[in-house]
């Protein structure tokens, strides 16, 4: 049974859509058909109000009434069509147009015929009684004209009490009247009167608001003029009486002049006095008053600003000098440390005239001493190639009588290129040990070198050949391999130290230092003489500093 109800409802919906889309049934007619359908519930109140509103139009009124008369002709099982049509007619008598009421009265005979409507359902229930009762009530109402007027007046009163919007967006109001048309017209007139009254009230409110706003503006203008007058009056009074301004009074005047500008921003009217009073507020408290008599006080007031600007310039210049402070401090330390080393040279070598270099080299290595010390026990003298004037330590004392007046760039000038460029930038800390090295230079080494040199190079070709290693004069090479070749330096005796020094000398040549060949005999004699002098020297500090210098050059040889 439920399936049949669902099926019937679906069929009705399809039929309705076909009527609207295919058959082009008018919308109002379709609304009347929906209000008088075969559903087990009555028509909706909104649909009834729309139908009653449509009866006020002639064309739609005829359309609505034709559908209702068609529904009243139904019989039998379609009793719901008849019953719902009678419900719509009852609503139109109270709320419909006069035209609709007149047409309903004309069809009183058709409605009275429904008082004998009969239909009994299969279950034995008499459902025709609903139609009969409804038809009897409508016929009784139609026969009483006064009753119709009373019902219509009551409906109008209800509409005035409850105002709503229809589907077309029109507000419905009505007043009490004898006829429906009169009530509708009176309702519209009442609506117009309400509208006029509201518009007048709004206009009065707007005018009162404008008046109050103009009053506020007038008060604001008077306040602004009073403020500006008091400001100018106070200025004239200060110029005439005291002649000396204080910063507090100047700040007070600036605040007073700035106050009207903040108040004028809240309003839109133009005030020329307000704008003129805004201009002095842009200046500072230290501005010079051109109309005042005391200009000296103004200049005194403006003094701190000038000093602050000069201080800013001085700070800027100090910042520029501070950018180079790192370089200046380094050179000052080098010079100061060089002066200290010069005093040490005077203490240890006072018998010999020396020339010291006071200026520091541009490249100073402050951490080179930690790498140069190898071992304090290995006492190795300085090779001749390292003692050439090309690598003079800038902090060391150089003897004036070097090489006995001979040419310092003599026979072994070609070997000066054998020394690597590593020690040419000596460390500042290591220069203290180099100051004692001229003791071994000036005593024995230069004289014995010139006396015992068996071979003098007279030709530049021979010197170039010797420097390049094209001619090998080293016939007596050492036959024993030393541990220094491998890089092992330990606790060596005096004889082992000689071998280690020779090995370090040749290791420097093998690594590309280019120290030259054929110097083994010369180097050994030089080493023996230096060892004898060191043994004969009674001064302990001399032996200590010479050993430190030898250690430094030994480490330089290993680095090469």
Swiss-Prot record:
GO BP, sorted A to Z: protein localization to plasma membrane; protein targeting to vacuole
Residue ranges, compositional bias (Low complexity): 526-536
Residue span, ENTH domain: 20-152
Main location: Golgi
CDD domains (UniProt xref): ENTH
Any one Gene Ontology molecular-function term assigned to this protein's record: clathrin binding
Tissue expression pattern: Mostly expressed in cotyledons and flowers, and, to a lower extent, in roots, leaves and siliques (at protein level).
Stretches for region Disordered: 190-288, 414-453, 517-560
Compositional bias segments (type: Polar residues): 221-233, 274-287, 414-439, 544-554
Cell location: Golgi apparatus; Prevacuolar compartment; Cytoplasm; Cytoplasmic vesicle, Clathrin-coated vesicle
Keyword match Cytoplasm: yes
Phenotype upon loss of function: Defect in vacuolar trafficking.
Sequence motif Clathrin binding, residues: 296-300
Alphabetical keyword list: Cytoplasm, Cytoplasmic vesicle, Cytoskeleton, Golgi apparatus, Protein transport, Transport
One GO location term (cellular component): actin filament
SUPFAM superfamilies in the cross-refs: ENTH/VHS domain
Residue stretches of biased makeup (Basic and acidic residues): 193-220, 234-251
Protein function: May have a role in transport via clathrin-coated vesicles from the trans-Golgi network to endosomes. Stimulates clathrin assembly. Does not seem to bind to phospholipids. Plays an important role in the vacuolar trafficking of soluble cargo proteins at the trans-Golgi network.
Subunit structure: Interacts with clathrin, VTI11, GAMMA-ADR and VSR1. Binds to the deubiquitinating enzyme AMSH3.
PANTHER family membership: CLATHRIN INTERACTOR 1, EPSIN/ENT-RELATED
Family membership noted in the UniProt record: Belongs to the epsin family.
Name of the protein in question: Clathrin interactor EPSIN 1
Gene: EPSIN1
